[in-house]
């Protein structure tokens, strides 16, 4: 998976993503479950969740992991359009920590595929261009960190 170029996001794109985010940020368990169900090869990376995805979904550990993902995305999305330095710091930190865990660009790309599909399923397909720009921005920074060259 190639590292995407750093996009320039318009104010309208930022507003669209932030508006959608307000409507879906409470869906962390569903987002994580959709990703892991679509790409089950990633489930073993979440060792504390056990061996059965369906059984794990209702556990406190699953909700805790989903909440961590949502909190991270919240931190980045709230900085869009106003604090790129802060967003990059969060993204570099995530890339560095996930490199240490052996997470690959392919696995991040699988998360993108699942998120894009889920956004469409939830009725947010009209803003998919804005979401793609947001994910390109995130992956530009994360992938550089995975490559050992944080930006």
From Swiss-Prot:
CDD domains per UniProt: Mb-like
PROSITE patterns, A to Z: GLOBIN
UniProt record similarity statement: Belongs to the globin family.
Transmembrane segments: none
Pfam annotation, one family: Globin
Annotated protein name in UniProt: Globin CTT-IIIA
Domain Globin: 8-147
Native source species: Chironomus thummi thummi (Midge)
InterPro entries found in the cross-reference section: Erythrocruorin, Globin, Globin-like_sf, Globin/Proto, Mb-like_M
Chain segments annotated as coiled-coil in the UniProt record: none
Residues involved in heme b binding: 98
GO terms, molecular function: heme binding; metal ion binding; oxygen binding; oxygen carrier activity
Any further remark recorded for this protein: There are at least 12 different components in Midge globin.
Oligomer and partners: Monomer.
Assigned keywords, A-Z: Heme, Iron, Metal-binding, Oxygen transport, Transport
GO (cellular component) term, any one: extracellular region
